[in-house]
Each structure stands twice: as structure tokens, then as C-alpha cells.
Swiss-Prot record:
Quaternary data: Homodimer and heterodimer. Heterodimerizes with CXCR5; leading to modulate the interaction between of CXCL13 and CXCR5.
Originating gene: Gpr183
Gene3D superfamilies: Rhodopsin 7-helix transmembrane proteins (1.20.1070.10)
Protein name: G-protein coupled receptor 183
Ranges for region Interaction with G proteins: 122-130
Source taxonomy: Eukaryota, Metazoa, Chordata, Craniata, Vertebrata
Amino acid sequence: MANNFTTPLAASHGNNCDLYAHHSTARILMPLHYSLVFIIGLVGNLLALVVIVQNRKKINSTTLYSMNLVISDILFTTALPTRIVYYALGFDWRIGDALCRITALLFYINTYAGVNFMTCLSIDRFFAVVHPLRYNKIKRIEYAKGICVFVWILVFAQTLPLLLKPMSKQEADKTTCMEYPNFEGTASLPWILLGACLLGYVLPLAIILLCYSQICCKLFRTAKQNPLTEKSGVNKKALNTIILIIGVFVLCFTPYHVAIMQHMVKTLYAPGALGCGVRHSFQISLHFTVCLMNFNCCMDPFIYFFACKGYKRKVMKMLKRQVSVSISSAVRSAPEENSREMTESQMMIHSKASNGR
């Protein structure tokens, strides 16, 4: 792709700038990070999905959005083993461009499906708390089903074109996959990325902040009208949950999108200033902020655990049941083992006695 659409800026960069000079450090830290994300993300989200499916008869709009968020996280974790190997080899992709495109697809599906479903959750909570009479449970679940289908269609429409474009690039001694330098020669890339950041991050963040600020105002008004709600601690828990959700969203998604936007603005308005040092710094910032953004799939199960009382209770119940099963099986196997050892000893004694006679 970079060979077909080159700009004067790309041509002026030359081929002497090593944008992967940090690979010796990255090949250690990034595989460790993504291994952690893979284990925690897969186990945590599978556990959340099991709990949701077991209680599907009691499903509501909030649970439905959460389930779709969990599914997008699980899809993302399936792509991580290949990325772990890629980073461990020092940014060398050895399994073909087709798999590179698929991992890119799963990456962007997780990113923007996650953002969209978190936005849906904030809107859903807004109507449930601020305007409860406008949307009863039946209507909200029906609307939620349609919205989930629409979100998936929108995300796939945005990401499926990635399968049509080469995602890998042959460098001097390696093949890189899904790296920004592979596409920086595309003339329209800055505008595409700025548009994606505005629609995929700035707009959802504005909606989330607006919805949760209105919810907080409603909770404060309710506490003033009824002091018992403040004493019960319900409002405090709700506010802590809101702070947790906004904090995770801002911490995980903001650094990546800010890094992209500021670099694209530089590319458009000060192309001459983008020397090798600036480009390499941006490449390092991308790797760091992408790691931070991907850590979001580990945080989602913890949000469910602390925010949803029913989910927390179900998880603890499952863990207790598993522990009790393990203990009972261990206790049951111990007498069997002792009995087997005693039987073998008795047979040996009987055999020796027979030989003595």
C-alpha cells in the first residue's frame, strides 16, 4: 500500500531511519505484557460470560451490553498468541499476511466495539436513573437487542476493509505486521485517522461524560430529598462505580488517541519537522499506548465484579463450589489410596508367609 500511494513527506524520510531501534527492550516487555493480558483477559471474560449465560432468563439491557462487551474482549484475546510471538521475535511476522490482516481486524473490532458498548451502557444507565418512566424494562431490552446488532454491523463495516489491504511490510531483515510505518505513505491517512479518533473516541467520551454527569446530579438530588439513601450507602457505591468506569475508559483509551491526533496534526501542518527522532518517538509512544489500551479487556471483568452485586455473588459462589469439589475429591481419594496401600501390604505379607511354609 505504501508503494502505491507515496507523499513527498514519505519520500523525504528515506530508508536510513530505524523506527524499531527499541526492539531489544520491546521484545521482552511487550510479550510479558500481552501474556498477562491474555491470561487475565481470557479467564476473566470467560468467567463473566458463563455467569451471564447461566442467568440469561433474567437478562436486561445492561447485561446484554455487558455480554457483547465480553464477547469482543474474548475475540481479541484469541489474536494475542500470534502477537506475543511477533514481539518476542523483535517485530518479525513469520506466518503470512493473511493472518496479519485477521489479527488487525480483531484488534480494531475489540477497540471500537468496546468503546461503542461502553457508550451504550452509559446511555442505558442514563435513561434507567434519570428518566426511568420513559423506558420500561421490556422496551429497553428490545431496543438493546436492535442497538447491539447495529453496533456490530457498524464495527464490521468499518473494519472489514482491513482484510482487503496488506497489513505486513518487508523490512531489511524482518517482516513487520500492523505497524504505523507500513502505511504512513498513504496521502489520506492523517485525515482518516483524525476522523476515526473523533468518531471512535472524542464523541463516545463526550456522551459518556454527559450521561454519567447527569446520573451524578440525579443521585445528589435524590440524596438531598431522602437522607436515608445517603445513610444506606447506595449512592456512594453508585458514584464509586461511575468514577471507576470513567477512570478505566480515560486511562486506557485517551493516551493512544491523543498520541494519534497530535502526530496527525503535525503531519498535516508541519511535515518538515518530522525527522527520524520525531517519528521514532511516535512509534515508541504507539507501542506503549496500544499496550495500555489493550489492558482494557482485563479491566472489564473487574468492573463487573465490583459494580454488579449479582455478578460478584455468582462468581464467589462458583469459586466456593469449585474449592469444595476439589477438597471433597481429595478427601475421597485419600482413603482409597490408603486402602490400596494396605491391600498391597497384606498381599505381600501373605505371599511371604506362603513361601516360608
